[in-house]
A protein has these predicted regions:
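Interhelical loop and helix-boundary elements at the membrane-water interface
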Residues: 1-152, 161-196
């Protein structure tokens, strides 16, 4: 139970940043940045590189929200030392505002960068943006949609701290389950078009 709590304490800023970024992307703030990252580029196969849903607003938004969420979470944890001790990164690094600014921004960057290959592959397989595959790929991509960004966060964390295979697997399983639950809440709040 303690190890599950440690994983959640470590991942919480990324989870919060993802929710805040979804709200931000649906808002009218900075609409000028709501432009596709691929600028409408169509490759030789006649398909878009990433599609309309991968925007600069979402890309930079996740980096900024990641930094802000990490800072706020770190300040909260400072007031609860028993929880702060469980944070996997703070076992190796001091919990400072500057450190958390960088950590949160880089986790946000890892999150959005590792979503891009998934979008690229889905466009090749003619899976529409923001939709679930309706063919034999359905369950494969439901799973990949939940873990692609988590893989990015794990790889990034490995540059900072040692993670056991159990911790990495725990991040994927807990993160995927949490991602599905949060997606449902965002769907019910009409911030997301797809339940998965």
């Amino acid at each position: 139970m303690r190890s599950i709590l440690a994983l959640y304490i470590t991942l919480m800023p990324v989870i919060l940043a993802g929710v805040l970024n979804m709200i931000f992307c649906k808002s009218s703030l900075l609409e000028v940045a709501y432009r596709p990252m691929d600028a409408g580029l169509i490759l030789k196969d006649g398909k878009r590189l990433f599609g309309d849903n991968k925007t600069w607003k979402g890309f930079f938004g996740m980096i900024v929200w990641g930094a802000l969420a990490q800072i706020l979470w770190s300040l909260l944890l400072k007031s609860i030392p028993t929880l702060e001790k469980l944070h996997l990164v703070y076992a190796f690094y001091e919990n400072t505002v500057l450190f958390n600014l960088v950590l949160g921004a880089l986790l946000g960057l890892a999150y959005v960068l590792f979503e891009l290959p998934n979008s690229f592959i889905k466009r090749r397989l003619e899976i529409r943006e923001g939709k679930t595959a309706e063919n034999g790929w359905k369950w494969t991509f439901i799973w990949i949609d939940q873990i692609d960004s988590l893989i990015g966060c794990i790889i990034f964390l490995l540059f900072y701290i040692p993670l056991s295979w159990q911790q990495m697997l725990g991040i994927l399983i807990l993160g995927a389950g949490t991602h599905l639950g949060v997606n449902r809440l965002l769907y019910w709040a009409k911030l997301r078009k797809n339940r998965m």
